[in-house]
Design a protein with these regions (language model features):
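Acyl-donor binding region in acyl/amide transferases
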Residues: 57-60, 65-66, 77-177, 293-353
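Active-site/acyl-donor-binding loops of N-acyltransferases
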Residues: 2-13, 78-79, 120, 169-195, ...
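Hydrophobic alpha-helix feature that most strongly marks membrane-spanning transmembrane helices
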Residues: 241-248, 263-267, 280, 286-287, ...
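A conserved beta-strand-loop-helix scaffold within acyl/acetyltransferase catalytic domains
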Residues: 9-92, 142-143, 151-307, 398
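Proline-rich intrinsically disordered, low-complexity coils
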Residues: 20, 26, 35, 39, ...
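Low-complexity, flexible helical/coil segments
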Residues: 52-55, 96-101, 109-113, 189-193, ...
Length: 401
């Protein structure tokens, strides 16, 4: 166990420790503090991330203690060789392509991510963390970044109410705030999938029924919900790679070891919505469940027939059907393809980055260049649903909270 040296002990008896992995943190503490209805914060999923090759070069956990009690936990992901063209959109990637060919090292951006690589950001705590806890955490984050020579530091995808307790400490440490892509959340509570469809507005309801008919009219297609999908791992990876080849960003790319690890665990509870054309897998949506929440986490599609057979929509319909049958109160989906998800009835959940750089000149450049670039990318992703207020404006109205 390594102790963060600078600001390790606060005036109220708090101390900060840096733990090397999820197994170093007591299970009871994690389960008490993690959101009970968000499967992306299940301990098992973090363990699967650590044992696979999603992209980070390392993981760590900042733990604030007061005596024997755990007051706060903040997961960290360390990227030593992250490339800028992995985290920008396709338009920016095309502009960077000549530089990537000639001087690829210039695109290297060592980065420390704080929060959850695969989900919404949180500081795990019994309640909103207090001023001293936040100050200690932010100071410890910067200590880790300096020690590991990771110049850029990002608190990733925090909802406004999660970021608010940290805001003063972050501002004092030189962080600035940029709106990130929103999460998508579908509120449930219907007794059946048909009741869900009936409650949709007229146009989305007609479109949904039309897409379901188109799927059913195509010979040989069927949907199955699988608990055991070990025999399908090569096919899953192939379909997922088809999707990632068209993706705007490739920060976190799951691999065969992640899928195999998830398949072998009971935590989180998982189901695979699988679509077959005769005996051939042509689409899937990997879903996780915890408490009254579900997440459609990763999708794969055979683009040979995806459009004509409406595969994207129908695996999502089946996931919604499954979540309703499981008694879920909401299901979340990925931060992509917003228009189809809005037609499903999803809310947009506002999220933010807090960012800085350890050195003043790069920090000033980031502060000047990133907000307009990310705002433009957000506008392209959301179209008419893009927020109307500047992404750097403090106290912006929330999409849904």
């Amino acid at each position: 166990m390594t102790t963060v040296e600078q600001d390790a002990v606060g005036t109220s008896g708090y101390r900060v420790e840096l733990l090397p992995g999820i197994d170093s943190l007591p299970r009871a503490a994690w389960e008490e503090l993690a959101p009970g209805d968000d499967p992306m914060w299940s301990r098992g999923l973090f363990s699967a991330m650590e044992h696979s090759r999603l992209g980070p070069d390392g993981y760590a956990y900042l733990v604030v203690r007061r005596g024997a009690a755990v007051a706060a936990v903040l997961p960290l992901c360390l990227f030593r060789e992250l490339r800028l063209d992995q985290v920008v959109g396709s338009r920016e990637r095309r502009l960077l392509a000549p530089l990537a060919r000639v001087l690829p090292r210039l695109l290297r951006v060592p980065m420390l991510f704080c929060g959850n690589l695969l989900g919404q950001g949180h500081v795990l705590a019994p309640g909103p963390p207090g001023e001293e806890v936040c100050r200690l955490l932010v100071s410890a984050v910067l200590d880790v970044a300096r020690a590991e020579r990771l110049g850029t530091v990002v608190f990733k995808d925090f909802a406004p109410d999660e970021l608010d307790p940290l805001r003063t400490a972050l501002e004092q440490a030189g962080f600035f705030f940029v709106r990130s892509l929103p999460d998508t959340r579908l509120r449930l509570g219907q007794a059946s999938f048909e009741e869900y469809l009936t409650a949709l507005p007229a146009k989305p309801r007609r479109n949904a029924r039309s897409k379901i008919r188109a799927f059913r009219a195509r010979p040989g297609l069927r949907l199955e919900v699988l608990d055991d999908f070990d025999h399908l791992l090569p096919e899953l990876l192939g379909l997922y790679q088809q999707v990632m080849a068209r993706a705007e960003q490739t920060l976190d790319v799951i691999d065969a070891s992640f899928l195999a690890d998830v398949q072998g665990r009971d935590d989180p509870r998982r189901r695979l919505v699988a679509c077959f054309e005769d005996d051939r897998l042509v689409a899937f949506l990997l879903c996780f469940f915890a408490g009254s929440g579900a997440t459609g986490a990763r999708i794969g599609l055979d683009y040979r027939i995806a459009h004509d057979a409406r595969l994207y929509h129908n695996v999502h319909y089946e996931a919604i059907r499954l979540a309703i049958a499981s008694g879920c109160r909401h299901i979340r989906f990925a931060q992509t393809a917003y228009q189809p998800k809005l037609e499903l009835g999803c809310d947009l959940v506002e999220q933010w980055y807090a960012m800085t750089h350890l050195r003043p000149l790069p920090r000033a450049a980031l502060r000047r260049l990133l907000p307009p670039a990310l705002s433009a990318a957000l506008d392209r992703a959301l179209g008419p649903h893009a927020p109307g207020r500047p992404p750097t404006e403090k106290g912006s109205a929330r999409a849904t909270g």
